[in-house]
């Protein structure tokens, strides 16, 4: 099973990615993770990416593409993979298509988790994190026993700068501008399946399993 997972910040992609990878026994390939791995291992591609990142520049598509393609060449991807965070634009999608075509591999499904904008904002701005032990909370769905105090270590909880309203609105705008053309691209290729992410985690996962089961037939 070869799958791409799309969805805005706050859609629960990370949670679903772990479940999909386990259910279908395929590696979860997060571009953030493989970038960090290349930086840690000080690979040539990692060094190249770091040059751009140190200057505050976006890493060019050709570098990102190569980092992802190197990961897809590994043995654990022979029977499938789940791509999370890539492609981010149509140019990357076209390069991925070319790469897979050259390998004689086809993409089974592109899952697009959709969540109402208001719900996304509530999910993200409600997050609270313990700066001491890393525990995470949500002021509505999983609050601490005492307001703003970590249950585990007693430290004051914080709201990450990325989770503040202004930052969330900007992140959603960037995602929408980048992803709308991608959604159109995969719709034309008849590989896109929209998933209602407003449901519970388990309900969303059941819908994903059904979609992937139908595609795998």
Curated annotation (Swiss-Prot):
Region (NMP): 30-59
SUPFAM superfamilies recorded: P-loop containing nucleoside triphosphate hydrolases
Binding site for AMP: 31, 36, 57-59, 85-88, 92, 160, 171
Subcellular location: Cytoplasm
Pathway: Purine metabolism; AMP biosynthesis via salvage pathway; AMP from ADP: step 1/1
Pfam families tied to this protein: ADK, ADK_lid
Classification via PROSITE patterns: ADENYLATE_KINASE (PS00113)
Paired cysteines (S-S): none
Region (LID): 126-163
Recorded GO CC terms: cytoplasm
Superkingdom, taxonomy of origin: Bacteria
Nucleotide-binding found in the keyword field: yes
The protein's Enzyme Commission number: 2.7.4.3
PANTHER family: NUCLEOTIDE KINASE (PTHR23359)
Known function: Catalyzes the reversible transfer of the terminal phosphate group between ATP and AMP. Plays an important role in cellular energy homeostasis and in adenine nucleotide metabolism.
Subunit and interaction comment: Monomer.
Protein name from the UniProt record: Adenylate kinase
Organism: Thermoanaerobacter pseudethanolicus (strain ATCC 33223 / 39E)
Gene from which the chain derives: adk
């Amino acid at each position: 099973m070869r799958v791409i997972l799309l969805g805005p910040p706050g859609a629960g992609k990370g949670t679903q990615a772990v479940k999909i990878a386990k259910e279908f026994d395929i590696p979860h390939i997060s571009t953030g993770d493989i970038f960090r791995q290349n930086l840690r291992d000080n690979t040539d591609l990692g060094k190249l990416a770091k040059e751009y990142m140190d200057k505050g520049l976006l890493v060019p598509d050709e570098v990102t593409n190569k980092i992802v393609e190197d990961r897809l060449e590994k043995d654990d991807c022979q029977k499938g993979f789940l791509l999370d965070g890539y492609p981010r634009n149509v140019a990357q999608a076209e390069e991925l298509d070319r790469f897979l075509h050259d390998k004689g591999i086809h993409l089974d499904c592109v899952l697009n988790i959709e969540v109402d904008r208001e719900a996304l904002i509530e999910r993200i701005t409600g997050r609270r994190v313990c700066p001491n032990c890393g525990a995470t909370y949500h002021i509505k769905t999983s609050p601490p026993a005492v307001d703003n105090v970590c249950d585990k270590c007693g430290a004051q909880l914080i709201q990450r700068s990325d989770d503040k309203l202004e930052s969330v609105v900007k992140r959603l705008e960037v995602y929408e501008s980048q992803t709308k053309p991608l959604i159109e691209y995969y719709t034309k290729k008849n590989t896109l399946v929209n998933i209602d992410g407003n449901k519970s985690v388990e309900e969303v996962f059941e819908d994903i399993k059904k979609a992937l089961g139908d595609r795998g037939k």
